[in-house]
Regions:
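Flexible, glycine-/charge-rich segments associated with ATP-binding catalytic modules
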Residues: 1-9, 109-152
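Conserved short strand/loop->alpha-helix "switch" segment adjacent to the catalytic nucleotide/phosphoryl-transfer site
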Residues: 20, 24-48
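Conserved polar catalytic motif of the HATPase_c/GHKL fold
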Residues: 49-53
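Short helix-loop "hinge" at the ATP-lid/N-box region of the Bergerat-fold HATPase_c
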Residues: 54-58
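Short beta-strand/loop element within the Bergerat-fold HATPase_c
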Residues: 65-75
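Glycine-rich/acidic phosphate-handling loop/turn and adjacent ATP-lid/helix
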Residues: 76-101, 145-148
Length: 152
């Protein structure tokens, strides 16, 4: 018997009202999969931050697209938020260094793993994973596909 794990794919205009749509879809899927309420709250906060970054930063004065994939895997739920906008120059995400923006460090702190990919003019992809059962270990943080040398 083959079990098909749920997957949700959304593509919408990168507008503020889309953030709530993504958050509700994620909450519904996570609740149906019996995630702990505290983990669902972390997921919703992290996905809100990632989507808000797209709405605020990805597109220079023009309409753009927000893409979100939510996929159940054997041991975790993976959420990918991407845009095709101005891009970001990835750099190590450090939780101990104050920065103007708190979104990416917050996503890294809330998720069990975090990966940031992007380049100038090519858009940005934020991938975060939430394990079904959580340990006490800090999140694995990758920047542009490589382990972050200074995740803490």
């Amino acid at each position: 018997m083959t079990i098909t794990l749920p997957e949700v794919r959304m593509t919408m205009p990168a507008r503020p009202e889309g953030v709530a749509v993504v958050r509700q879809a994620l909450a519904g899927m996570a609740d149906a999969m019996d995630f702990d309420a505290a983990v669902v709250a972390d997921m919703k906060m992290a996905v809100s931050e990632a989507c808000t970054n797209v709405v605020v930063h990805a597109y220079d004065d023009s309409a753009g697209i927000l893409e979100v994939d939510i996929r159940a895997e054997e041991e975790a739920l993976t959420i990918v938020v991407r845009d095709h906008g101005t891009g970001i120059q990835p750099r190590p995400i450090r939780r101990d260094v104050p920065a103007l923006g708190l979104g990416l460090p917050l996503i890294a702190a809330l998720s069990d793993s975090f990966e940031l990919r992007g380049s100038a003019g090519q858009g940005t992809e934020v991938r975060m994973t939430f394990a079904y059962s959580r340990g006490d270990d800090a999140a694995d943080v990758r920047v542009d596909g490589r382990w972050n040398p200074e995740p803490n």
